[in-house]
C-alpha cells in the first residue's frame, strides 16, 4: 500500500461517511483544484468510492465526471481507511 500525503490523509479522514465535494473544500487545507486532483488519485487507487444520488438514494457509481466533481458524493473505502493507520 502506498503512503498517503497530507492532503490525501485529510480527504480520507473527511470521508468516513459519504460527503459532497463542497464538504471537502471546507475541511481540507488546500485549494479546490488540488483537492480535486488528489481525490481523483484516491479514486484511481480505490481508496475512495464515487456515489451518485439515484431517486434520493446514494448508489455506487462506476464512472464520474471529473469536470463536475460536485455532481457526486464520495466515501472512503476500507482500503482507504486502512491507509489512515499507516
Question: PLM features: residue spans?
Answer:
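Short amphipathic alpha-helical interface segments
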Residues: 2-30, 37
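Generic detector of short alpha-helix boundary/capping microenvironments
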Residues: 12-13, 34, 64, 68
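Short, amphipathic alpha-helical interaction segments positioned at domain boundaries
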Residues: 60-86
Amino acid at each position: 500500500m502506498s503512503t498517503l500525503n497530507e492532503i490525501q490523509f485529510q480527504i480520507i479522514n473527511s470521508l468516513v461517511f459519504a460527503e459532497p465535494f463542497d464538504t471537502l473544500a471546507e475541511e481540507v487545507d488546500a485549494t479546490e483544484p488540488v483537492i480535486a486532483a488528489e481525490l481523483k488519485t484516491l479514486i484511481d487507487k480505490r481508496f475512495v468510492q464515487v456515489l451518485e444520488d439515484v431517486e434520493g438514494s446514494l448508489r455506487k457509481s462506476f464512472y464520474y465526471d471529473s469536470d463536475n466533481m460536485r455532481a457526486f458524493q464520495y466515501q472512503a473505502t476500507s482500503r482507504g481507511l486502512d491507509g489512515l493507520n499507516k
